């Protein structure tokens, strides 16, 4: 009897230890895991990296659109590649107003073609988007993170869903917080992912209202630095619909923390950038990032990208693995 009690006690002790260790172990969400293709297509991530590095080497400005494409995919229907689909009637996400300035689709096509040649029908387009976004940042000497893979591709794309789900450059802080929370992202994620604006361009129509008619009285946004507003008006006339503007002037091809310095100086390009100062928690992170050497932001960016990459994923037998990213099988 004593031996039996000892055996039971040891078993219970081991169970407790197992549970404690499990609570600290990294968990995979909804079937995703790092290295999902290690056996089925062991060269997959290397193939993606090689293609992306070559693309960024040829054009450093392409990195930001590739990052943005993944963001736009995840916020609409989840990270399942619907932003890549094309419909004959043009009623797809690609043709929604927020997505008209997306570019880099040919790079996704090239990566997918290389993967299909190596291991047909294995790597999903949604995973391609996730891997490409990471590798584009690394190619700029930006942050790196382990990408969870195992997503499957969606079958539906809808032009109206992008307008309903994508955060707008005109949003105030309350709207931004609500939108991010609806995707399982918190205030810190909002600020960190907004930091992606350290690279890339905006366009005049996105700030015309801030410059010329913010309250309907022909005035500019009082939250925009006066001197900076003058410079922007010199580049963007009220009817300008095409001119591109550097999100992070002088540093828009370099991934760094300088975006937060601009925001703190009231020089964020979009109204949504300025809004980060309108909440104590988001403002605190902006100011905290000013006093780091970038390492905190880089680490946090990777964490938030992993979280974003879990939004609404399809795994297992749900969805499909497309042969070509622009169409369902």
Swiss-Prot record:
Membrane-spanning intervals of the chain: none
Active-site residues, Swiss-Prot/TrEMBL: 72
Catalysed transformations (reactions): 2 a phenolic donor + H2O2 = 2 a phenolic radical donor + 2 H2O
Coiled coil (residue ranges): none
Glycosylation sites: 158, 172, 213
Matches recorded under Pfam families: peroxidase (PF00141)
Superkingdom of origin: Eukaryota
Amino-acid positions noted as binding heme b in the UniProt annotation, renumbered to this chain: 197
Enzyme Commission number(s): 1.11.1.7
Subcellular location: Secreted
Disulfide bonds: 41-119, 74-79, 125-325, 204-236
GO terms assigned for molecular function: heme binding; lactoperoxidase activity; metal ion binding
Signal peptide per UniProt: 1-31
Additional note from the record: There are 73 peroxidase genes in A.thaliana.
Stated role: Removal of H(2)O(2), oxidation of toxic reductants, biosynthesis and degradation of lignin, suberization, auxin catabolism, response to environmental stresses such as wounding, pathogen attack and oxidative stress. These functions might be dependent on each isozyme/isoform in each plant tissue.
Protein family: Belongs to the peroxidase family. Classical plant (class III) peroxidase subfamily.
Protein name: Peroxidase 56
Species annotation: Arabidopsis thaliana (Mouse-ear cress)
Source organism phylogeny: Eukaryota, Viridiplantae, Streptophyta, Embryophyta, Tracheophyta
Gene: PER56
């Amino acid at each position: 009897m004593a031996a039996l009690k000892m055996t039971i006690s040891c078993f219970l002790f081991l169970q407790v230890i197992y549970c404690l260790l499990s609570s600290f172990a990294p968990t995979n969400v909804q079937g995703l895991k790092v290295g999902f293709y290690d056996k089925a297509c062991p060269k997959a991530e290397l193939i993606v990296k090689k293609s992306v590095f070559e693309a960024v080497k040829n054009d450093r400005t392409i990195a930001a659109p590739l990052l943005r494409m993944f963001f736009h995919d995840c916020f609409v229907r989840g990270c399942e590649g619907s932003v890549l689909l094309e419909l004959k009637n043009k009623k797809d996400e690609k043709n929604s107003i927020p997505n008209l300035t997306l570019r880099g689709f040919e790079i996704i096509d090239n990566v997918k073609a290389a993967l299909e040649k190596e291991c047909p029908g294995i790597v999903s387009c949604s995973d391609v988007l996730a891997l490409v976004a990471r590798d584009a940042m690394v190619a700029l000497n930006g942050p790196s993170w382990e990408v969870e893979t195992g997503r499957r591709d969606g079958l539906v794309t809808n032009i109206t869903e992008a307008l309903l789900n994508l955060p707008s450059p005109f949003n105030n802080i309350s709207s931004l917080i609500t939108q991010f929370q609806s995707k399982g992202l918190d205030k810190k994620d909002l600020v960190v992912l907004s930091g992606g604006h350290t690279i890339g361009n905006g366009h005049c129509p996105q700030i015309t209202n801030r410059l010329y008619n913010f309250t309907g009285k022909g005035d500019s946004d009082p939250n925009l630095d006066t001197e900076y507003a003058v410079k922007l008006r010199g580049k963007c006339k009220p009817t300008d619909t095409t001119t591109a503007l550097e999100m992070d002037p002088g540093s828009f091809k370099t991934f760094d923390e300088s975006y937060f310095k601009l925001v703190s100086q009231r020089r964020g390009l979009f109204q949504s950038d300025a809004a980060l100062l309108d909440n104590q928690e988001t403002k605190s992170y902006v100011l905290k990032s000013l006093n780091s050497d970038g390492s905190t932001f880089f680490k946090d960016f990777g964490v938030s990208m992993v979280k974003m990459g879990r939004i609404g994923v399809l795994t297992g037998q749900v969805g499909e693995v497309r042969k070509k990213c622009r169409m369902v099988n």
